[in-house]
Every structure is written in structure tokens, then in C-alpha cells.
Design a protein with these regions (language model features):
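Conserved beta strand-loop-helix elements of the APE1-like EEP
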Residues: 52-56, 80-96, 124, 204-205, ...
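Beta-strand-turn-beta hairpins that frame and shape the catalytic cleft
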Residues: 81-95, 112-137
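Extracellular/periplasmic catalytic domains that process cell-envelope and extracellular macromolecules
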Residues: 23-24, 53, 78-81, 112-115, ...
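Active-site-proximal beta-strand/loop segments in catalytic clefts of secreted hydrolases
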Residues: 1, 33-35, 63-66, 89-91, ...
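Active-site beta-strand/loop signature of hydrolases that rely on acidic residues for catalysis
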Residues: 1, 18-44, 88, 121-123, ...
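Surface-exposed cleft-lining segments at the edges of enzyme active sites
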Residues: 3-8, 35-37, 101-111, 137-146
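N-terminal, active-site-proximal structural segment of metallo-dependent hydrolase catalytic domains
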Residues: 1-73, 77-82
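Metal-dependent phosphoesterases centered on the DNase I-like endonuclease/exonuclease/phosphatase
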Residues: 143-243
């Protein structure tokens, strides 16, 4: 009955648990997606600011991929959205750039839809003229397929261009697709009515890259029913990973 999945208090509780978990893991690099800055759905809580404040030892970069004053659907509507992807690093970052990805949607739908992008961060490697290139991504989900293909190709081209320079690359995030080398037999498609991710043929990235996911746990689940007493009834997916 509502697009608001949590109360304001619950969002703050969730953010506290998220930042506590990130601090306990103490990773060198963190790649986050769907971080709201000022969105009605999260009660306009600045999640990016909370993450920065609670992880003070990290430098950070943030890029919008969803920014609109009004999403007019469904009923009641989603409303205002200001959301993006966020990269945090314990290593000094020399540059961080937002790279625009191809948008498969036309006017007027594109006005209130996501504008997918990458954050490309570069870390100088001491004693060399090389860099570690970190790519944070969140690729298309609900298009007919052309957008995913175009965005995946652009990602592959960027990774290849950086390795051609002699740099090292790590790309990670939400591909909204499943790598062809991932065993998803534990998560069969339950219904043709539910969203199904397409496959990324990892051979498209060539032999110089390794595509990795951990399929021992799903990284996504459907939102077609209430969470209560339904843990074993959802459609599960493995759509997040690293290159």
C-alpha cells in the first residue's frame, strides 16, 4: 500500500547497522550502490553523509545516478529521489570521475528514471607510474536488453583501455546480470512473471580479466510479497560481483 518500506526511525536504525558492519569488516575499498542523499522513500535522510561521518578514516566519492524532483508512479508515487553510488577507500585517490553510461530510455520516461553511471577512481601505486583503477557500477535492470548490452560493452572498453596502459583494475557492484560462470542452480526461476536477469558472457571481457561472484548466498531477492514468514518463498538472484 506504500512505497515507504520503513519509518524514519527504522531507516536510521538500518543505517547504524550498515555502518557498524562496514566498520567491523574494515575493508580497504568499499563500493556501495543505492545510497540516498535526499529521497522521499528514505524520509530525505542523507545516507551518504551518515556513511562518511561513521567511516572517518576513508576518503569518499559520490555520484548521482537517480535525481528527480518527482517520480509520479506508482500510486501513491515514489516522489523525490536523489540517490547514487559511493566509493570509499583507505588509499589516497588521485582522481575520481563520474562516467555517464548509455541510457536506453526515451522522453518522457527518462525524465524520472535512472541515469546509470560509473565512478572511476584512481590510486597511484608507490614506486611505479601505474595506478589501481577502481570502478564502482550499477548497471541497467528494467530495459529490453539493449541498455545492459551497451553499458556492459562500455565497461569492458574502459577496463581494457586501463589495462592497455599497464594499470590494474577492479570493477565491482550491481551488474543486474549474472556472470555465465556463476552456478545459480540453487536459485531456479520460480515464475515467468518475475523479473529474470540476463547473462553476461564473461568471454566478452577476454582472457585478461577474472569475473567473480560468491553464489553461496544470493545478492538480491524479489519484492513481490511481504517479508514476514516468507524467507523461503522469494525469488533469489546472484547479480553482484567483481571483475
Amino acid at each position: 500500500d506504500s512505497v515507504y518500506t520503513s519509518t524514519k526511525e527504522q531507516v536510521l536504525t538500518n543505517m547504524s547497522a550498515i555502518t557498524e558492519e562496514l566498520n567491523s569488516l574494515s575493508p580497504d575499498i568499499i563500493l556501495l550502490q543505492e545510497v540516498d542523499e535526499k529521497s522521499s522513500r528514505s524520509h530525505k535522510i542523507n545516507e551518504a553523509s551518515i556513511i562518511k561521518d561513521e567511516l572517518p578514516s576513508y576518503n569518499s566519492s559520490y555520484a548521482y545516478n537517480y535525481k528527480t524532483l518527482m517520480v509520479p508512479y506508482p500510486i501513491p508515487p515514489i516522489g523525490q529521489v536523489a540517490s547514487g553510488i559511493m566509493t570509499l577507500s583507505t588509499y589516497p585517490v588521485s582522481t575520481a570521475c563520474r562516467i555517464k553510461l548509455p541510457c536506453p530510455f526515451s522522453y518522457p520516461i527518462r525524465l524520472c528514471n535512472l541515469k546509470r553511471c560509473l565512478i572511476v577512481s584512481k590510486v597511484p601505486i608507490d614506486g611505479t607510474n601505474k595506478e589501481l583503477v577502481i570502478v564502482n557500477l550499477h548497471l541497467e535492470a528494467y530495459d529490453s536488453g539493449e541498455g545492459k548490452a551497451a553499458q556492459t560493452k562500455m565497461l569492458a572498453d574502459i577496463l581494457q583501455a586501463e589495462t592497455d596502459k599497464g594499470n590494474y583494475v577492479i570493477a565491482g557492484g550491481d551488474f543486474n546480470q549474472t556472470f555465465s560462470n556463476t552456478d545459480i542452480s540453487a536459485y531456479p526461476q520460480q515464475s515467468d512473471e518475475l523479473w529474470a536477469p540476463s547473462l553476461i558472457d564473461i568471454s566478452e571481457f577476454g582472457n585478461n580479466f577474472t569475473c567473480i561472484t560468491d553464489s553461496s548466498d544470493p545478492t538480491c531477492r524479489s519484492l513481490d510479497k511481504s517479508y514476514d514468514d516468507a524467507d523461503d518463498k522469494f525469488q533469489f538472484y546472484v547479480i553482484d560481483g567483481f571483475i
